[in-house]
């Protein structure tokens, strides 16, 4: 295993981190995951890739993503989502429902990543990707009108 691979294998215990710290990590993991997915499926100009990635990573898109996966979550995962939704970081934007849901999703992603539950994380993110494909078609259709 390379040093780079070892870098992501961590002895950090997610349960000992604040929920906002989990969201901080989750934001990076989620964004990187969909940036790479976008590169694989949209081998076009960077501007197009950026706009496509925004469908996934903006707060509104993350709220939709959370709605897609909520019914598949375990009780443990639901607790993390609930904590993320109610976190101090989520409340910074006042009553912005999109931002609260985005923070909740990021907390879950960060938690699963730091727990090393990569298969579970991929399973959930693939559900998001499959659902967002329909948003992408709508966005492309709307941009042509």
Curated annotation (Swiss-Prot):
Family per record: Belongs to the MrnC RNase family.
One GO CC annotation: cytoplasm
Xref: HAMAP family: RNase_Mini_III (MF_01468)
Biological role: Involved in correct processing of both the 5' and 3' ends of 23S rRNA precursor. Processes 30S rRNA precursor transcript even in absence of ribonuclease 3 (Rnc); Rnc processes 30S rRNA into smaller rRNA precursors.
Name of the protein described by the UniProt record: Mini-ribonuclease 3
Superkingdom of the source species: Bacteria
UniProt cofactor(s): Mg(2+)
């Amino acid at each position: 295993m390379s040093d780079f691979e070892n870098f992501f294998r961590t002895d950090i215990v997610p349960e000992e981190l604040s929920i906002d710290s989990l969201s901080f990590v989750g934001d990076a993991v989620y964004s990187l995951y969909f940036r790479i997915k976008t590169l694989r499926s949209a081998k076009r100009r960077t501007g197009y890739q950026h706009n496509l990635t925004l469908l996934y990573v903006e707060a509104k898109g993350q709220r939709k993503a959370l709605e897609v996966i909520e019914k598949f979550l375990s009780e443990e995962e639901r607790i993390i989502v609930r904590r993320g939704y109610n976190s101090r970081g989520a409340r910074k934007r006042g009553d912005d429902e999109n931002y609260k849901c985005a923070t909740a999703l990021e907390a879950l992603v960060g938690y699963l990543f730091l727990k090393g539950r990569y298969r579970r994380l991929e399973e959930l993110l693939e559900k998001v990707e499959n659902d967002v494909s329909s948003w992408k078609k709508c966005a492309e259709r709307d941009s042509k009108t």
